[in-house]
Structure formats: C-alpha cells, structure tokens
C-alpha cells in the first residue's frame, strides 16, 4: 500500500530497475555520438534531424533518471545504492560530454546551413535554442584559450571551495548561555530556533552569539568573496564582455541599464519601508510589553496559534486558496495530491527546506519536496511550491523544447500563489485582528525581503565589482561600509546615522553576514531578480483576486510559454511591462494599502 505522504519517484523509472534505466541511457548516448559523427551531422538536413531526434530522446531519459537519483538522495543522503549510482552516472556523463567537446564550434562552422534547415516549420521548435547559441558566437573563446583553460581548470573555483568550508565546517558556532544553562549549537538553524524562544533573555543571549558566526572568519571570507569576483570579472573579459554584470545581462537578453532601472524603482519603496518598520516596532512593543524593541525581539512570531495543523488541512486550504485560478488548475493540484507528487514529512537524513523539481522535459509528474512542520507556515510553502509545479505542468503541455522557466521569472507563479493565500486570509481574518495583523506583517516582510533586502545585496555586489574593475581590492571594513551605505538609498536611513553606527563593533558584527551569502558565488548575478518575481506576482494575484478575466487569461499564456521567449517578453504575456515605472508603482501602492489595513487593525486591537 502506498504511503500517501511519500512521493512516488518510481514512476520516473518506467517500472524498470535503476540498472536497466542506466543501460538505456548509455545505449542512447552511443547512438547520439554516432549520429553526431564529429559534427558531420550538420552537413545535411536528414542527418541533422536524426541528431535532434536522438538528442531529444537522450534528454528525456536523462531527466527521468537524474531526477530519480538526486531526489532519492535528497530523501535520504545516506542511501548507498543511490550514491553509488550517482557516482557512476557522473563518470559516464563526463565521458559523454567529452564526445561533444567540439559541438559548439561545429554549430558555428555550419551556422548558415543550420539556419536554412530551421526555415522548415517542422524544425521551428528548435530555433530559439540554436539562435541563442549563434548569438553567443562573438563571446566564445578561441580553441587555444579553451584548451589552456581546460588544462588549468583545477585552479578555478578555489574561492568558492574556501567559502564553503569557512561558512560551514569552520563556522564559529558558540553555545548560548543564559542563567547558567547552556544551549548547545550544532548548526545555524539551532540559533534560529532559539531566536524564536518566548524568553527574551534567551533571545538576547542567542542574538549576541548569532551575529558572531562569521565574525571570526571575516577577513578570510572577505578575501574569498573578492577573489571570486576577480575571477568572474576576468572570465567575462576573456569572453569579450565589458564586465561580469554585462555578461549576465547579455545571457538574460536584457540591457545592463534595466538592472539600474530596477534599483531606481525599489529605491522609491524606502519611505514605505521606514513606515513599516515604525509600525512593526509599535506592534511588538505593545504585544511584548517592552520599553524598546530590539533586533532579537523582531525574530519572534506574534500571535502564534497552538493548534496543530495537519497535512489534510493544508491540502483542503490550498484547494480553497487556489480556487480562483479555475477548475483546470485545481484539477492539476489534485493530481499532485493524489498521484504522490509530494514528499511531505521531515526525516533524519532528508534535505531541509522545500523545492519543486526542474529539468522536466519528458516528465509527467512534477515532484515537490517539503518538510511539513504542523504549522500554517507550511501552507505558504505548499502553495508556493505548487506554483512552480503547476507552472512546469502547463509548460510541458504546450512546449516540446523550452519548458523550464528561467530564474528571471520563475518565482512569479509561486509568489502569485502566496499572494492568493494572503488575499484569502485577508477575508478569512477580517474580524480577527491578531491573525490579520500576523498575516499581513508576514506578507509585507516577504515583500521587503524580496525587494529592498535583495536589491541592497545586488547593489552591494555591483559597487564591489566596480572597485575591482578600477583595480581596488576591498577588505572587510570596505565591504561592510559598502553594504551599510545601501541602507541610505533603500531603507531611508540618514548617512550620518549609518556612519555613526559603523563605528560600533556590535553593528559591524550584525553586518558580517553580507560576506557569507552563497548566491554571490553562483556566477550569474541574480539576486535582483527576486524583486521581479515579487512585483509581478503581486500584480497577477491582485488582479485575479479582483476577478480580472484578462489577467487570468494572460496568466495561463504565461504559464504555458515555458522559456520559449526572452525573459522580459515572457513577463509581457501577463500584460506587465517591467521596463515601465507603472507596475512597480502599482505593486508599491498595494503594499501601502496592506500597511493601512495593519494600522487600522492595530488601533482596534489596542482598544
């Protein structure tokens, strides 16, 4: 009998063993190498079509097999059979890739012929991906440079390896001591748990230790980050891009100026951010009955319900929340529940957090990993991840090649679902001031976390990269000064206030997390894109919630498009042009409306 709270990954193997699936991939790999024929497949249309067909088959088999392996590993990272299979697959894939080391150059060599082939309507689905390859031609390395880089490849990414050690194994995890009682700390999450303790003294003691976790290694972490940026800048210039940021903008099919435009729009949220922080502190001061609200007070969840929340309740609530999206959307959500797409429960060796799978070409099930914690926060996680999975379902139904959305707009579908939950709770809690305040405080927090905070991170990256381009090598003090100054532009703090705070060691410690953000090592300058997902997601949910049929129709066009269009063009399917100030202002106005509701509810709560 199936466990309804476990995902059923076995469907990915088509009722065959791991070994049989691996053998099938190896067989198709051999056929693909033979069809490639060292690039001769591009010399005539028939062999080109055969190569594409076998490549499609290989991709689909590989997606099924790797999704099975890596998700089984995340289910239990000590599964020896799975870990051995992953090792064998990685060895195979390295050899497979070697057989196609000349692929890009052969595509360039046969560009004119291939463009002629693509005029055939039967091959139109391959056009976007191949045109993106040709677009990148001026930025490809010469064969001599490529050969040299492959020889010295082991020297690369040392900064990231050092960072991974310094930010995990070498973390300064000190036990928290309060009133002679020691609270052992084995991971960063242990600090986070204590920061939610109802005892204020424990929270204060925890906060003082928590802000020191990167402090001991601050100089090494700073050096690691700067070396990482130096490498990224140098690689971008090797590929004929003026800078690392310009390279990533090119890859996203946008102008560099669009990133600055996003910064300008988010900077206009500063006054509202200040108003939110003031109101939030007033609420915490009232509820906690303290004279002054400290940072370690704001980590506490207000108005926590003691009721245990079940998976079955979460399922029913998710269906209610997403009902506005229509019968077909609900039908897919029910498929996710009934066909075991979701691995619900936490387990000892399981990956922490939540995600919806990617690389979905050839799949019919779009799996979700969760760690359900029996609280309503898991409902937010559930609708978020369902947003991703249903997005994958629609894209798979309408696209044969460009299915997985890019990170540029991938969060829109999940944020829209979170906002539909917010609007549902606005109605549900209209007579419950405590829960209404808690719901909206959480949502406004998310908004500023994804816009203001992430843009501060992005501005920090940009300003640091600028110093590197003018041959300066910033140290820890310079880095935290850069980061602190972003609070002037995006959070509305006065420059002199920030300058005075920077003189205090405690404040410097509280800023040291900026040198320990894994996203900065990703190599694609992407944290500003969280603001895009947040703003577009708000507008989608707001309009669908108000019964806007045009937005609903546009939304399903968006979900169905996958990655078949350039990122900004994909978002325009929603009727949203993010190169214009209007959508940014509209989202901002909606947040101001939420803030007004919180103020009104707080006044009633005080009576």
Curated annotation (Swiss-Prot):
Residues reported in the UniProt entry to bind Zn(2+): 384, 388, 391
Annotated TM spans: none
CDD domains attached to this UniProt entry: M3B_PepF
GO biological-process terms attached to the record: peptide metabolic process; proteolysis
Catalytic residues in the record: 385
Swiss-Prot/TrEMBL cofactor(s): Zn(2+)
Highest taxon in the source lineage: Bacteria
Free-text cofactor note: Binds 1 zinc ion.
Family per record: Belongs to the peptidase M3B family.
Protein's name according to its UniProt entry: Oligoendopeptidase F homolog
Protein's gene: pepF
């Amino acid at each position: 009998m199936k466990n309804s709270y476990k995902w059923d990954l076995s469907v990915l193997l088509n009722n065959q063993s791991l070994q049989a699936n691996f053998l099938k991939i190896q067989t198709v790999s051999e056929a693909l190498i033979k069809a490639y024929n060292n690039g001769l497949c591009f010399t005539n249309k028939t062999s080109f079509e055969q190569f594409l067909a076998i490549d499609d088959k290989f991709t689909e088999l590989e997606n099924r097999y790797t999704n099975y392996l890596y998700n089984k590993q995340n289910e239990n990272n000590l599964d020896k059979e799975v870990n051995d299979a992953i090792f064998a697959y990685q060895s195979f894939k390295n050899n497979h890739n070697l057989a196609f080391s000349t692929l890009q150059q052969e595509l360039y060599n046969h560009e004119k012929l291939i463009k002629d082939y693509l005029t055939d309507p039967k091959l139109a689905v391959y056009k976007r991906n191949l045109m993106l390859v040709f677009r990148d031609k001026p930025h490809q390395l010469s064969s001599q440079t490529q050969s040299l880089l492959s020889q010295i490849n082991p020297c690369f990414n040392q900064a990231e390896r050092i960072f991974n050690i310094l930010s995990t194994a070498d973390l300064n995890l000190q036990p928290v001591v309060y009133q002679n009682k020691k609270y052992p700390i084995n991971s960063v999450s242990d600090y986070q748990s204590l920061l939610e303790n109802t005892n204020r003294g424990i929270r204060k003691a925890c906060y003082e230790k928590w802000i020191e976790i990167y402090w001991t290694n601050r100089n090494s972490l700073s050096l690691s980050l700067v070396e990482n940026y130096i490498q990224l800048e140098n690689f971008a210039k090797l590929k004929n891009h003026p800078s690392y940021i310009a390279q990533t903008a090119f890859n996203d099919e946008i102008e560099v100026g669009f990133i600055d435009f996003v910064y300008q729009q988010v900077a206009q949220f500063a006054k509202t951010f200040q108003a939110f922080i003031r109101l939030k502190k007033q609420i915490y001061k009232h509820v906690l009955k303290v004279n002054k609200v400290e940072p370690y007070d704001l980590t506490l969840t207000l108005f926590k319900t003691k009721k245990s929340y079940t998976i079955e309740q979460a399922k029913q609530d998710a269906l209610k929340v997403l009902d506005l999206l229509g019968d077909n959307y609900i039908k897919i959500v029910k498929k996710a529940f009934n066909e075991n797409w979701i691995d619900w429960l936490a387990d000892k060796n399981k990956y922490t957090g939540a995600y919806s799978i990617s690389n979905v070409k050839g799949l019919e099930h779009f799996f979700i990993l969760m760690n359900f914690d029996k609280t309503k926060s898991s409902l937010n996680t559930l609708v978020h991840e369902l947003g991703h999975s249903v997005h994958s379902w629609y894209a798979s139904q309408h696209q044969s090649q460009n299915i997985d959305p890019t990170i540029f707009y991938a969060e829109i579908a999940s944020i829209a679902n979170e906002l539909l939950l917010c609007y549902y709770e606005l109605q549900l809690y209209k007579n419950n001031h405590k829960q209404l305040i808690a719901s909206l405080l959480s949502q406004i927090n998310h908004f500023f976390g994804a816009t203001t905070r992430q843009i501060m991170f992005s501005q920090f990256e940009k300003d640091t990269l600028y110093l590197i381009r003018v041959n300066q090598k910033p140290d820890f003090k310079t880095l935290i000064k850069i980061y602190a100054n972003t609070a002037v532009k995006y959070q509305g703090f006065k420059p002199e206030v920030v300058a005075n705070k920077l003189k205090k060691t405690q404040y410097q410690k509280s800023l040291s997390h900026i040198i320990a953000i894994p996203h900065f090592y990703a190599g694609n300058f992407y944290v500003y894109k969280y603001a895009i997902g947040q703003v577009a997601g708000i507008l989608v949910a707001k309009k669908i919630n108000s019964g806007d049929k045009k937005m609903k129709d546009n939304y399903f066009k968006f979900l169905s498009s996958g990655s078949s269009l350039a990122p900004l063009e994909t978002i325009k399917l929603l009727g949203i042009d993010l190169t214009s100030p209007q959508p940014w202002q509209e989202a901002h106005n909606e947040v101001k409306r939420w803030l007004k509701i919180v103020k009104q509810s707080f006044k009633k709560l005080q009576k």
